[in-house]
UniProtKB/Swiss-Prot annotation:
Positions of the catalytic residues: 300 (proton acceptor)
Reactions listed under catalytic activity: carbamoyl phosphate + L-ornithine = L-citrulline + phosphate + H(+)
Organism: Pachysolen tannophilus
Compartment(s): Mitochondrion matrix
Designated name of the protein: Ornithine transcarbamylase, mitochondrial
Gene3D superfamilies assigned to the protein according to its UniProt record, in alphabetical order: Aspartate/ornithine carbamoyltransferase (3.40.50.1370)
């Protein structure tokens, strides 16, 4: 979970010239639909994906066997530049559930931007597989892969967006509050990163008011902020950003945080801990902030004690973290079904 990158990277595709094949040409076939962020989904499309995830969860938990196997005989590739627990297991599980064969390709397995350009690697892998789950470092990498892939690219995390987690979180909230999200309030206490970028958009599209508390000096990129404000105005939801966790928590039904120190930021640990002083979620904070009586806690994991106290994280009545983690599987199934099996037709 890395801080948002600059608008120039968001608004322009950056194509690396290193090792670029001069003879490469774009295919004339119709371009597939990709999942990059929550910004690209309509309100109805997001709702449909969440509902399909809930459906598959009910089927699996009921012990019903998926006999359709729509991806039978097809390979689903997972290109991961970063290590992962939930994303890898859920993506491979989703492919297997739909009858496909998952193929994991880590940074030590392929020549991803090292001895071969990202352009050439994407062209080759997409010619052999049905789809690509891409967990990469830079948002520009996702943009470049989408530009040159002949199959759907599913953003499994980049430094700006995390759409699979956002779909998961809306599913978790919906099933925890009487199968509805309308009129709820979500409080985010933590960093400005890829998780809240997509969760904020998804929540506002789902009828959830959003209040965000971040340390002084941290800012959202304008593309995210302007998109969130536009959605808020259109959908009748509210967005508030503050530096005070107690202010954000006031009246919140859902309290969410995430890691403060992402992969690759380990050298910044001491600086980060100082920056986030007073941001650990405790029951005292929740009480002082006057959260709603039915408040629940969420965290996409992995979790560290400085982010949230054990009394909150392991509270079986309040904490949804393990249900949330399991729901990653059903979100991945819904996305794979929607973007690969149904070729991006979500409604």
């Amino acid at each position: 979970m890395i801080n948002s990158i600059s608008n120039t990277v968001l608004l322009k595709s950056v194509v690396s010239k290193r090792f670029f094949s001069s003879s490469a040409k774009m295919s004339s076939q119709a371009k597939p639909r990709h999942l990059v962020s929550m910004l690209e989904l309509s309100i109805k499309e997001l709702e449909s994906l969440v509902n399909r995830a809930a459906y598959h969860k009910q089927q699996i938990r009921s012990g019903l066997v998926n006999t359709t196997q729509p991806l039978s005989g097809k390979t689903v590739s997972l290109i991961f530049n970063k290590r992962s627990t939930r994303t890898r297991v859920s993506s491979e599980g989703a492919a297997a559930y739909l009858g496909g064969c998952p193929m994991f390709l880590g940074k030590d397995d392929i020549q991803l931007g090292v001895n071969e350009s990202l352009h050439d690697t994407t062209k080759i892998i997409s010619s052999m597989t049905s789809s690509i789950f891409a967990r990469v470092n830079k948002h520009s990498d996702i943009q470049e892969m989408c530009k040159y892939s002949s199959v759907p690219i599913i953003n499994a995390l980049c430094d700006t967006f995390h759409p699979l987690q956002a779909i998961t979180d809306i599913l978790t909230i919906k099933e925890s509050f009487g199968n509805t999200t309308k009129g709820l309030k979500l409080a985010w206490i933590g960093d400005v990163n890829n998780v809240i970028n997509d969760l904020c958009i998804a929540a506002l599209k789902s009828g959830i008011d959003v209040s965000i508390a971040v340390p002084s000096g941290l800012k959202f990129e304008e593309l995210i902020l302007s998109g969130a404000k536009e959605i808020s105005a259109e959908n009748g939801t509210t967005l508030k950003i503050t530096n005070d966790p107690l202010e954000a928590i006031n009246g919140a039904n859902v309290i969410v945080t995430d890691t403060w120190i992402s992969m690759g930021q380990e050298d910044e640990r001491l600086q980060k801990l100082k920056q986030f002083e007073g941001f650990q979620i405790t029951k005292e904070m929740i009480s002082k902030g006057k959260a709603a009586e039915n408040w629940k806690f969420m965290h996409c994991l992995p979790r560290h004690p400085e982010e949230v106290h054990d009394e909150v994280f392991y509270d079986e009545e309040r904490s949804l973290v393990f249900e949330e983690g399991e729901n990653r599987l059903y979100a991945a199934i819904a996305v794979l079904e929607g973007f690969v099996v149904n070729k991006g037709k979500l409604l």
